UniProtKB/Swiss-Prot annotation:
<dbReference type="InterPro" id="IPR050112">
    <property type="entry name" value="Urease_alpha_subunit"/>
</dbReference>
<dbReference type="InterPro" id="IPR011059">
    <property type="entry name" value="Metal-dep_hydrolase_composite"/>
</dbReference>
<keyword id="KW-0963">Cytoplasm</keyword>
<feature type="binding site">
    <location>
        <position position="219"/>
    </location>
    <ligand>
        <name>substrate</name>
    </ligand>
</feature>
<dbReference type="InterPro" id="IPR017951">
    <property type="entry name" value="Urease_asu_c"/>
</dbReference>
<keyword id="KW-0479">Metal-binding</keyword>
<dbReference type="GO" id="GO:0016151">
    <property type="term" value="F:nickel cation binding"/>
</dbReference>
<feature type="binding site">
    <location>
        <position position="246"/>
    </location>
    <ligand>
        <name>Ni(2+) 2</name>
    </ligand>
</feature>
<feature type="binding site" description="via carbamate group">
    <location>
        <position position="217"/>
    </location>
    <ligand>
        <name>Ni(2+) 1</name>
    </ligand>
</feature>
<comment type="similarity">
    <text>Belongs to the metallo-dependent hydrolases superfamily. Urease alpha subunit family.</text>
</comment>
<keyword id="KW-0614">Plasmid</keyword>
<dbReference type="InterPro" id="IPR011612">
    <property type="entry name" value="Urease_alpha_N_dom"/>
</dbReference>
<comment type="pathway">
    <text>Nitrogen metabolism; urea degradation; CO(2) and NH(3) from urea (urease route): step 1/1.</text>
</comment>
<dbReference type="GO" id="GO:0009039">
    <property type="term" value="F:urease activity"/>
</dbReference>
<feature type="binding site">
    <location>
        <position position="138"/>
    </location>
    <ligand>
        <name>Ni(2+) 1</name>
    </ligand>
</feature>
<feature type="domain" description="Urease">
    <location>
        <begin position="133"/>
        <end position="568"/>
    </location>
</feature>
<dbReference type="GO" id="GO:0005737">
    <property type="term" value="C:cytoplasm"/>
</dbReference>
Length: 568
């Protein structure tokens, strides 16, 4: 027996299907489902009178050891830079994504490729958007509570360093690296720490790599000279770790051309490429045209608004220990904050020329705002620039959506050498998954799975009669406590440190995983964000940015989506 139902009714019951569109929060962005991997009429649904019962959608004779899923997220709308925008069930086994497709009982349902058994738990994802957990790979680990805010904002992987004067994203020296890896045992997230890359002698750099850093960070506050840049890159090439750089704002040791010569074509992740966060003034942004440079933005300058310029001056003064009574310190701050390059930054993101978004947490940026700032920028660019050429005539924004979600998922993973484990919902990767109510997409995840287990979600009062009793807040789930947090989290370290067995030496319970291939990515590998302008110039007097001769700019916004409707 078959029954026909209209699209609206189907979407209410099982979520959208092929051709349906979903608005992302209160943005101007609409995602259109490109493919539905479920079998219509045989949907997997949990609850009283629903299909996932013994002998119906649940196969009673299949154990976990025989292949039954540990978890199934039913009828999700997936937004992923690699998989696309699809409707499907998501299967989880042993902490990893087991499959994207149709889950259920193959004896009673058609098209089943993932078995639901008595050992399978269910998260009803009908009407929810599923994305890979976000990555923030520019974190100042100043606060031990950062992970709480990261999870509340959809971030499940945190790479960076601390303390470095609180300003430099460096964990300096082997003893401090050891202590941070031990401290991270308390956090139910994936972590990795950058060592100080500023040394003209390779010895101190190698000892940090051997101690367990996942990369090296060059920062102007420690002296980003051509000599330290070259030495750092030589060590990184030998040890297969990434180098992240904050260049010389004051141009004391050389200009952009000198830094470019010191890099000499080797791969490097350039932080806050626009320059307000630091870097050769005023032309660091010209590096987005280099094929070996992997550029990222930090979220305080994204998107450009009426308040951006004024806010940055105060933040620079505080972050870099500058004195407002010293004219040279004020001049330093003012040289970094340029409305013209900030305005160009939004457009370069929309063109796919800037590949990644990060926070610069507690050193001008906000860790919980990586994802909302990304989508605010995407929505602003649609409003000001119109549909991308690839989206013309589709009635949706799929290409733009994939471009922007890649900025905080797959591209940071590729840059850091950890894409084998995180960054997409492809089978075989760690099951770090955020589920979003479409109305709250990009701001407040409804549920976050970490390593295949619930770690954080919207949750009511624990003494309430139901989970929905107010106040509903972002709260820890079982995966965040006890020994579970070790089982669901990875600590990313250098290949040398993993081979040396630092997990046993340091007494670590979380899984220690070596990064791999951090020296090979180029701009061409940045998914949906690989555009390398042939010619990009920053005018040294007006700071206007020109790409292939055309002035690139946008208007500041006075109002944004995903803002005061959602957050006090």
């Amino acid at each position: 027996m078959t029954r026909d139902i209209d699209r609206e009714n189907y979407a209410e019951l099982y979520g959208p299907t092929t051709g349906d569109k979903v608005r992302l929060g209160d943005t101007e962005l609409f995602a259109k489902v490109e493919e539905d991997l479920r079998t219509h009429g045989d949907e997997a649904v949990f609850g009283g009178g629903k299909t996932l019962r013994d002998g119906l959608g649940m196969a009673p004779g299949v154990t976990q050891a025989e292949g039954a899923l540990d978890w199934v997220l039913t009828n999700a709308t997936i937004i992923d830079p690699i998989l696309g925008i699809v409707a499907a069930d998501i299967g989880i086994r042993n902490g990893e994504i087991a499959g994207i497709g149709k889950a259920g009982n193959p004896d009673t349902m058609d098209g089943v490729d993932m078995v639901v058994g008595p050992s399978t738990d269910v998260y009803p994802a009908e009407g929810k958007i599923a994305t890979a957990g976000g990555l923030d790979i520019h974190i100042h680990f100043n606060s031990a509570q950062l992970h709480e805010h990261a999870l509340s904002g959809g971030i499940t992987t945190m790479l960076g360093g601390g303390y470095g004067g609180g300003a430099t994203t460096c964990t300096t020296g082997p003893e401090n690296v050891k202590r941070f890896l031990q401290a991270a045992e308390a956090w139910p997230v994936n972590v990795g720490f950058y060592g100080k890359g500023n040394a003209s002698d390779p010895g101190p750099l190698r000892e940090q790599v051997e101690a367990g850093v996942c990369g090296l960070k060059l920062h102007e506050d420690w002296g980003s000279t051509p000599e330290t840049i070259n030495t750092c890159l030589e060590v990184a090439e030998d040890e297969d770790v990434q180098v992240c750089m904050h260049t010389d704002t004051l141009n004391e040791a050389g200009f952009l051309e000198n830094t470019f010569g010191a890099v000499d074509g080797r791969t490097m992740h350039l932080f806050h490429i626009e320059g307000a966060g630091g870097g050769h003034a005023p032309d660091i942004m010209e590096m987005v045209g280099e094929p070996n440079m992997l550029p990222s933005s930090t979220n305080p300058s994204m998107p450009y608004t009426d308040n951006t310029f004024d806010e940055h001056l105060d933040m620079v003064m505080v972050c870099h220990h500058l004195n407002p009574d010293v004219p040279e310190d004020v001049a330093f701050a003012e040289s970094r904050v340029r409305a013209e390059t900030i305005a160009a930054e939004d457009v370069l993101h929309d063109m796919g020329a800037i590949s990644m978004m990060t926070s610069d947490s507690q050193a001008m940026g906000r860790i919980a705002e990586v994802i909302p700032r990304t989508w605010q920028t995407a929505s602003k660019m649609k409003s000001q620039r119109g549909p991308l050429p690839e989206d013309e005539g589709t009635g949706a924004d799929n290409h733009r959506i994939k471009r922007y979600i890649a900025k905080y998922t797959v591209n940071p993973a590729i840059s850091a050498g950890i894409e084998e484990h995180v960054g997409t919902l492809e089978p075989g990767k760690l099951a770090d998954i955020c589920l979003w109510d479409p109305a709250f997409f990009g701001v407040k995840p409804a549920m976050t799975f970490k390593g295949g287990f619930p770690v954080h979600s919207e949750m009511g009062e624990a003494n309430g009669s139901l989970m929905t009793c107010e106040p509903i807040l972002q709260r820890e789930r079982a995966g965040a406590v006890g020994k579970a947090k070790h089982a669901i989290s990875l600590s990313f370290v250098s290949p040398a440190a993993a081979e040396a067995g630092i997990d046993e030496e340091y007494g670590l319970d979380s899984r220690v995983v070596p990064i791999e291939g951090a020296r090979t990515p180029g701009k061409d590998d940045m998914v949906y964000n690989s555009y390398c302008p042939d010619d990009i110039e920053v005018d040294p007097e007006t700071f206007e940015v020109r790409v292939d001769g055309e002035h690139v700019t946008c208007e500041p916004s006075s109002e944004l989506p995903l803002a005061q409707r959602y957050l006090l």
